[in-house]
Amino acid sequence: METLRYRFDGRNGARTGLDHALVGVVASGNLEVLVERVPLGGAMEIEIVTAARGFGEIWQAVLDDFAARHSLQDVRISINDVGATPAVVSLRLEQAIDVLQGADA
């Protein structure tokens, strides 16, 4: 297992909604994403625990893109991955933010 950690400066607070959201299932080729509102001094932190080692650059690219679209303050995202593709990662992140902010996913 490999653990990757990222921190982004947030510019926007997440819209009102839930305190946390969990989407996805840890299974072959998938992942789960937990998003929580926590005091982080305005930052967004993302931690990934993955079975697929050596993909840090790909994770960085996917998360840079996500952070550019959702520059959220005081949000922690925890990802448990079992080899999901970048498209699935992006989908689950979008779903988690939608659920956190009160939209149906």
From Swiss-Prot:
GO molecular function: acyl carrier activity
Compartments, as annotated in UniProt: Cytoplasm
Modified residues (O-(phosphoribosyl dephospho-coenzyme A)serine): 28
Modification after translation, per record: Covalently binds the prosthetic group of malonate decarboxylase.
Domain of life: Bacteria
Major location category of this protein: cytoplasm
GO cellular component: cytoplasm
Keywords recorded for this protein, A-Z: Cytoplasm, Phosphoprotein
NCBIfam families for the chain: malonate_delta
Similarity comment text for this entry: Belongs to the MdcC family.
Role this protein plays: Subunit of malonate decarboxylase, it is an acyl carrier protein to which acetyl and malonyl thioester residues are bound via a 2'-(5''-phosphoribosyl)-3'-dephospho-CoA prosthetic group and turn over during the catalytic mechanism.
Protein name: Malonate decarboxylase acyl carrier protein
Species of origin: Xanthomonas campestris pv. campestris (strain ATCC 33913 / DSM 3586 / NCPPB 528 / LMG 568 / P 25)
